[in-house]
Swiss-Prot record:
Annotated stretches, region: Disordered: 1-89
PANTHER family linked: UPF0561 PROTEIN C2ORF68 (PTHR34256:SF1)
Comp. bias (Basic and acidic residues): 32-46, 70-85
Organism: Xenopus laevis (African clawed frog)
Record-given protein name: UPF0561 protein C2orf68 homolog
Family: Belongs to the UPF0561 family.
Annotated InterPro entries: UPF0561
Species lineage: Eukaryota, Metazoa, Chordata, Craniata, Vertebrata
One protein family per Pfam: UPF0561
Length: 151
């Protein structure tokens, strides 16, 4: 008998746990209850009517500022450069003068225009030196005379 008493205090030779205390039973019951509760909550969420409710309106980010380059100045015509447009002469050609800075000056040249007057206007507008003004005057005079002959 003494051996039986010692056997009760020690582990049983089969190596099994003594489940008579009920501790694992309570853990198992809690796990099942938790699973059931989770399942019910999930089903209730699915049954709930899905409706569109607009959320609170968030403020939009302000539009990004976009760089818009300046428009190049419109081509200058005789109407903008002269006091009065010359309507009584026939139009010979359009003179486009491009300065060193890339600015283009356009002038409509008429048959009775003065080459020196045109060269002076262009040189004043583009700050040309005297030599350049003289060369421009000669070139304008050549073009005017060449086109007068063609007509």
């Amino acid at each position: 008998m003494e051996e039986e008493g010692e056997a009760q205090g020690r582990a049983v030779p089969g190596g099994r746990l003594n489940m008579s205390h009920g501790f694992v039973h309570h853990i198992r019951r809690n796990q099942l209850a938790r699973d059931d509760y989770d399942r019910e909550v999930k089903q209730a969420k699915e049954k709930q009517k899905k409706r569109y409710t607009p959320g609170p309106t968030r403020q939009k980010k302000p539009d990004l500022q976009v760089y818009h380059p300046r428009q190049r100045e419109k081509a200058h015509t005789t109407e903008t450069l002269k006091d009065e447009p010359n309507d009584n002469g026939t139009q010979l050609f359009c003179l486009d003068f491009e300065a060193d800075g890339g600015e283009v000056t356009s002038i409509i040249v008429y048959e009775d225009d003065d080459a020196e007057q045109l060269a002076t206007m262009i040189s004043n507008q583009n700050q040309l030196e005297g030599d350049m003004r003289e060369a421009l005057k000669q070139r304008i005079q050549e073009e005017i005379s060449k086109r007068r002959v063609q007509r």
